[in-house]
Amino acid sequence: MTNISAFLVKKLRARTGVGIMDCKRALMCMKGDIDKSVDFLRKMGQIKAEKKQFLLTQNGSIFISFDHNLGVMLELSSETDFVSKHKDFLCLGEKILDYVLTHPMESIEFIRKHFEDLRTSLVMQVNENIVIRRIQTLNKKYITGYLHGRRIGVLVQTSSINNHLAKEIAMHIAASNPKYLRSDLVPKSIMEREYEIQLELAMQSKKSKPILEKIIKGRMIKFANEISLLGQNFIFDPHRKVSEVILKNNIDVISFVRYEVGEKYI
């Protein structure tokens, strides 16, 4: 029998909101695998969706800088929230941004090496580990950015200038956390995983096969839209999808990047 620690139960509960005993049972059935336990609970109908699929585990700050032709976003990690607000921690982040803005970024490994002395000095000063976790640049036209409390940062590339709408789209991305630009860009593996879950849930209703297929199809469309920017309802006009808003304003969203402090990413 798999030994399930209290830490694993707490972690699964934080991720799903399900009760302690149900979390423990799921972990035992799935031999301690967190991701499989989430799917197990969903198939049992105990959670409708996983709201914290990209689990937040660290402290730190997001830094962004942008003009119409270049955007740079950095996540600088720390062990505690206190250090993430330290003036020298913030100063290091701004120095890294300034460097990337004026020098072609070869790789994050190069940036880490270039700033290693400053990072080490800060580590000794605050007695915490500091990590240059990730950096993203958008080196194209019509870049807009948004920073929410240094916890969430967004860069958006649009097809033309519309500063007000582009800013609202960036704010929408920060709030709604889409993972993909369009529903057809959702990876096949993600859709297949969700299909298995929805199939299991639908079969519990004991409806006829044609009705089940219709239910599953509707749920899959909804799922793909909910994690895709253009399929989401626009937070500033909830009766319209983002795709409808940009069509009305004759503007396209070409790409976007969203960082949230500590999130799991690939």
Curated annotation (Swiss-Prot):
GO cellular component annotations of the record: cytoplasm
Keyword line: Cytoplasm, Elongation factor, Protein biosynthesis
Location of this chain's protein in the cell: Cytoplasm
Pfam families, sorted: EF_TS
Record flagged with keyword Transport: no
SUPFAM superfamilies reported for this sequence: Elongation factor Ts (EF-Ts), dimerisation domain, UBA-like
InterPro entries, per the entry: EF-Ts_dimer_sf, Transl_elong_EFTs/EF1B, Transl_elong_EFTs/EF1B_dimer, Transl_elong_Ts_CS, UBA-like_sf
Source species, domain of life: Bacteria
Protein task: Associates with the EF-Tu.GDP complex and induces the exchange of GDP to GTP. It remains bound to the aminoacyl-tRNA.EF-Tu.GTP complex up to the GTP hydrolysis stage on the ribosome.
Family: Belongs to the EF-Ts family.
NCBIfam families found in the cross-reference section: tsf (TIGR00116)
Name listed for the protein in its UniProt record: Elongation factor Ts
Gene source species: Buchnera aphidicola subsp. Baizongia pistaciae (strain Bp)
